[in-house]
């Protein structure tokens, strides 16, 4: 969800010229649309691309972008033949119609339940809102060491600015893209579960899962790096088949 520039660690600019972008902290629908615009600009300026590789928020963002693009333009081909998704977090919506369907019609009492940030209150929300908010709060709790923000930072807002999760039970769009799903066996349970939910968005038979012994990370050991490389080569080869 990169929309702001970031000062990079010393020495990186000698390898990559920049600019260096950082993730958007707000996670709201407007920020999602800003991120989609950056993807569109990149596709237009530097594309076409055969595939995309994403980690954590990057993986979730590319899934969000493709889902909402597919929903808006179902007859258009997608810009990637394959995806490599490593430890994705929750995919978030930018589409106003989807967000309104999930959160926009809530009563003031239900809006207060969201703002309370309490599981006991969120569990009393109408079904669609409860599914989306539970998925979101599980990931927010699991990633606080990264975001350095409590639930209230994201939930105590006007409803149009509350992050809205794309859940496979609520977003029925599916992606016919060859996909490698990579996850660490010691990742937080909520993040591990999120990987399975994201996997549900894909209906291509060209799918492979690679699990490694790290947590919210990519493989680091030599054998696992080689195994992941083999899995990447396999999914790329599959994407080139009819």
UniProtKB/Swiss-Prot annotation:
One Pfam family recorded for the sequence: FSH1
Metabolic or biological pathway: Alkaloid biosynthesis
Keywords: Hydrolase
EC id: 3.1.-.-
GO cellular component, one term: cytoplasm
Gene Ontology BP, a term: secondary metabolic process
Record GO terms (molecular function): hydrolase activity
Catalytic residues as annotated in Swiss-Prot or TrEMBL: 56 (charge relay system), 138 (charge relay system), 216 (charge relay system)
Coiled coil regions, renumbered to chain: none
Family according to the record: Belongs to the AB hydrolase 3 family.
PANTHER family registered for this protein in UniProt: ESTERASE ALNB (PTHR48070:SF4), ESTERASE OVCA2 (PTHR48070)
Role, per record: Serine hydrolase; part of the gene cluster that mediates the biosynthesis of communesins, a prominent class of indole alkaloids with great potential as pharmaceuticals. Communesins are biosynthesized by the coupling of tryptamine and aurantioclavine, two building blocks derived from L-tryptophan. The L-tryptophan decarboxylase cnsB converts L-tryptophan to tryptamine, whereas the tryptophan dimethylallyltransferase cnsF converts L-tryptophan to 4-dimethylallyl tryptophan which is further transformed to aurantioclavine by the aurantioclavine synthase cnsA, probably aided by the catalase cnsD.
Name the record gives this protein: Serine hydrolase cnsH
Source organism per UniProt: Penicillium expansum (Blue mold rot fungus)
Lineage, top ranks: Eukaryota, Fungi, Dikarya, Ascomycota, Pezizomycotina
